[in-house]
Amino acid sequence: MNPPPSLLDKAAIVTGGSRGIGAAIAIELARRGAHVLITYNTASHKAQLVAEEIQKLGRKATVVQASSTDREGPNRIVQAAVSQYGRIDIIVNNAGMADDCLLQDLTHEFWDRIMDVNLRLPAFLVQAALQHLGPAPRIVNISSLAARAGYNATSVYAASKAALEGMTRAWATELGHRYNVTVNCVNPGPVDTDIMAVDENTDAEVVAYWNAKVKETPAAPRVGTPGDIAQIVAFLCEEGSRWCTGSVVNANGGLVTV
């Protein structure tokens, strides 16, 4: 007899779950037995397709539209999850915004736009969920290679992701005993998603730079796949990861190892 799925009947929230890494995470959690609520900003059709994939796996799927500028968004997400599943066992803060801006061109509007998605949403979503957490909850934040690499024109994005890693460590300490929760972070490098797509408007120097970096990737000379990241996130949501908290897991093939 096969063992039961490792996340059987767990209730998960995956922000930004309509495409790319978020979609892969949502489907992998469902494959391991979880019911999954995914959020999206504008890609409603893609979100519905992900929900259908989750349902094909025999799990419940819920879709919630939530803009990063909507201050009531976190509460609506949590209430939808509790209404459908009764509790929250897993939160994956995957929704993010990556955009470049030189310091000389920085505006308050640009700063707020990045920070709203990459910091405000995760913080207030977790806050709203605290009183509804299950008996052994898991929180996984999605960071970025940019948090540590010092790439040109990424100071705001890098700062937001470095701060998310810092919040991960602080939450692990602050919430661990009180809620029996583990809090970890996953740090992807380049991943083969539509966000990474190259077209005629992409700077040739940028393309050449990343092509060279990919060839240097220690694990293999390729970019990551959404599935590569989803496998790591799913493990951090399982009981077997119980002794791992406050960690930032490098999921970038070794491009950055600190």
UniProtKB/Swiss-Prot annotation:
It holds the Pfam family adh_short_C2. Disulfide bonds: none annotated. This is Short-chain dehydrogenase/reductase FrzI. One of its GO terms (molecular function) is oxidoreductase activity. The keyword Ligase does not apply. Belongs to the short-chain dehydrogenases/reductases (SDR) family. It catalyses: (1S,3S,6S,7S,8R)-7-hydroxy-6-[(4-methoxyphenyl)methyl]-3-(methylamino)-5-azatricyclo[6.3.1.0(1,5)]dodecan-9-one + NADPH + H(+) = (1S,3S,6S,7S,8S,9S)-6-[(4-methoxyphenyl)methyl]-3-(methylamino)-5-azatricyclo[6.3.1.0(1,5)]dodecane-7,9-diol + NADP(+). NADP(+) binds at residues 21, 41, 94, 157, 161, 191, 193. Signal peptide: none annotated. It is an enzyme of class 1 (oxidoreductase). Transmembrane segments: none annotated. Its EC number is 1.1.1.-. It comes from Cladobotryum sp.
